[in-house]
Regions:
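Amphipathic alpha-helical interaction modules
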Residues: 22-69
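Amphipathic alpha-helical binding modules
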Residues: 70-104
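Extended aliphatic helical segments
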Residues: 17, 42-45, 60, 70, ...
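Short terminal alpha-helical segments
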Residues: 1-42, 94, 101
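Alpha-helical repeat scaffolds in large eukaryotic proteins
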Residues: 14, 18, 46, 50, ...
C-alpha cells in the first residue's frame, strides 16, 4: 500500500461527492446523516495522523456548512501523508474512504 493508493481513493471519493449540495449531505444514513458519516471519517484520519506524528489527538470542528467537509477531508489526508504512517494505516485509510464511498 502506498500513498498513491490513498490518493486514488481520495480522488474517487471526491469525484463522487465533491459536487453535492446541502440536501444530499443531510440525507439520513445509519446513525445520522451522510455528513455525520464523513465527519467521522475526517476525525479518524486526523487521529491517525496525530498518532503517526506522536502528537495528541485533537477534536475536528464540525463546521456549520457541510460543503466544507470535502475540504476538511483533503486537509487531513494531506496531514496523514505528511506524517509518513505505516503501510497498515495507509491501507486502512484507503479502505475506509472506499467503504464510505460505496455506502454513500
Amino acid at each position: 500500500m502506498s500513498t498513491a493508493t490513498l490518493d486514488q481513493a481520495l480522488e474517487r471519493f471526491i469525484r463522487q461527492v465533491g459536487h453535492w449540495e446541502a440536501p444530499r449531505w443531510a440525507a439520513p444514513l445509519a446513525g445520522g446523516s451522510r455528513a455525520d458519516a464523513l465527519h467521522a471519517l475526517v476525525t479518524w484520519v486526523a487521529d491517525a495522523a496525530a498518532d503517526a506524528e506522536g502528537e495528541p489527538r485533537r477534536p475536528v470542528p464540525r463546521l456549520t456548512n457541510d460543503l466544507a467537509l470535502v475540504d476538511q477531508l483533503r486537509v487531513v489526508v494531506a496531514d496523514l501523508r505528511a506524517a509518513n504512517p505505516g503501510e497498515a494505516v495507509l491501507a486502512e485509510a484507503a479502505g475506509r474512504l472506499t467503504a464510505l464511498r460505496h455506502t454513500l
